[in-house]
Design a protein with these regions (language model features):
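Conserved ATP phosphate-binding architecture of protein kinases
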Residues: 1-5
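ATP-binding pocket architecture of kinase catalytic cores
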Residues: 7-29, 39-115
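ATP-dependent phospho-/nucleotidyl transfer catalytic cores
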Residues: 14-25, 80-95, 110-176
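Donor-binding/catalytic cores of nucleotide-activated saccharide
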Residues: 34-43, 168
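Generic, well-ordered alpha-helical scaffold segments in large soluble proteins
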Residues: 34-37, 107, 157
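Charge-rich, low-complexity amphipathic helices
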Residues: 35, 98-99, 126-127
């Protein structure tokens, strides 16, 4: 949404897919916790242009960062000027994306363990591997043999892929 005044910010109006994110209140609570934590870290470091580096959601009159119109959930955030998207990624952009993701993870390393699970088992690799193995066994589309090499590679790495879940169960890794 583009504002009329030249010096006023523009906005992004986004419909939240509540078929996927069924607990919209928890989703937004998580986003508020993450963006608030990152904003505080950047401000403490004296970072310039924090508004370009952290999403800012516009609250409703009731103070919520989403609106339900009776059918759909919506949220509005300020548009980040000069932001870009790329259809094709080259190694240089991949490097920058990896660096940004690493910085994001580092800033969240000490976030309190209060985030809710908005999609159950989404990051549970043991669960995802079981889903994959069930799909391979069913071979509903008849294409398993075409991708056997990739499936074998996944199986070779399965134990390592499940390490985080094991460490969490053993109390050696916080759930984040």
């Amino acid at each position: 949404m583009t504002t009329v005044e030249a010096d006023a910010p523009d906005y992004v109006l986004q419909r939240i897919n509540h078929a996927i994110f069924q607990n919209v209140e928890m989703l937004q609570s998580n986003i508020e916790a993450v963006t608030g934590h990152i904003r505080k870290k950047l401000e403490e470091k004296g970072e310039a242009d924090v508004e370009r580096k952290v999403l800012h959601f516009i609250p409703t009159a009731e103070g919520k960062t989403y609106w339900y119109d009776g059918e759909n959930y919506w949220r509005i955030m300020t548009f980040i000027p000069r932001a870009k998207t790329y259809e094709t990624v080259n190694p240089e952009y991949s490097y920058y994306a990896g660096t940004a993701f690493g910085n994001f993870q580092a800033m969240l390393a000490d976030i309190p363990d209060t985030l809710g699970e908005t999609i159950p088992d989404f990051h549970n690799m043991e669960f995802r591997l079981k889903q994959l193995r069930d799909a391979v066994a069913a071979d509903a589309a008849g294409r398993v043999q075409e991708v056997r090499y990739f499936l074998d590679e996944i199986e070779k790495r399965a134990d390592e892929m499940c390490k985080a879940e094991r460490l969490f169960r053993e109390g050696k890794l916080p759930k984040r």
